[in-house]
């Protein structure tokens, strides 16, 4: 007998910005100081936070005090093994002495100058060494900015304004990419789900330029290109969807998409904001054996210091400074750039990634064994360094697959994990991020606490679960 969880959930849009307050869980850890600060913060900050994704509900939003290695402490003194890591940036761990020493040296240089420094070239050379598609590089401050630049470049080069995104992908919060396809009330017999803005204030006119396709369906992409290819300038894809359970494009799909883009003069933009320098030294492009026209990086690039990059083929990148504008006051701040230089050196020249991947494989095996012993259907998707946990035997290959089974069981399990000192994202679509500092003690403790939290969750759900024989 295998337990399969099916539930009638709440609108996926509610989880889009981390709003988990509807899933009330008894807190057996003290959050008094976080709750007090939340009420104070509400007087000056919308939702009491400075990013919507940090709001976890009125009584569940926590505030960090400090972090070190793979662990984080909140202001109430609760200690967690952290598998969020700021949504992936801290790939070596919090407060890595090697990177922080480099950052302090960068601080002594002066900060920002409205001039360039020699280090910019050395970091660009490192990126080009690690990622063959990165013939030329321009730096930004965030993944959102890097994707903005890539889309602008693609439109400038092709002279075509329309673009394609993949359902379930995430590319930041600027107007052109802040769209999704809600599936709660979608009827497949009525055609594709409606393309919807993630927020009020995004002009509906933008939708006239946007096309969305399901992942891993090259035929759909080909049909779209044949019909509208003369107007489409860019295909924007996150091959491992970091905000959708790490659902991953197949190698064949990526190679097919690469060829279709070539045939129809569409620029292939690969968003590696989360996968870059994490799943391999050369990112998802190395894993899958293909080269983007343009690609974007951030997250792991600076081990938590704010820095990003857009990179790509020289013929596209040379448009910058000629016909395409790009810049920013804080771009290549001396602290962030020094941190990136050291982080990339470590990732390129040491076994850090192998250490992370080994930990991730052992974590999957341990968690999988615990779930299997209880007859709970499950699968892992993505990469060991950023695993998505899916409560079904068959892993999803598209966003539509993910949405077929609601995630209320995960959404009940996650707060119990928090109670037991394991910090994962309340939103089931965010993967478990790992860092080099996660060690054997972290693994042993994680598996013990995962098992205990799982037992509590199963007990609390009781008759809400349905048993399906497979």
Enumerate the language-model features and the residues they cover:
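Aromatic (phenylalanine/tyrosine) cluster motif
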Residues: 5-7, 17
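Short, Lys/Arg-enriched N-terminal segments with co-localized hydrophobic residues
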Residues: 16-26
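Conserved N-terminal phosphate-binding loop of PLP-dependent enzymes in the Aspartate aminotransferase
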Residues: 27-470
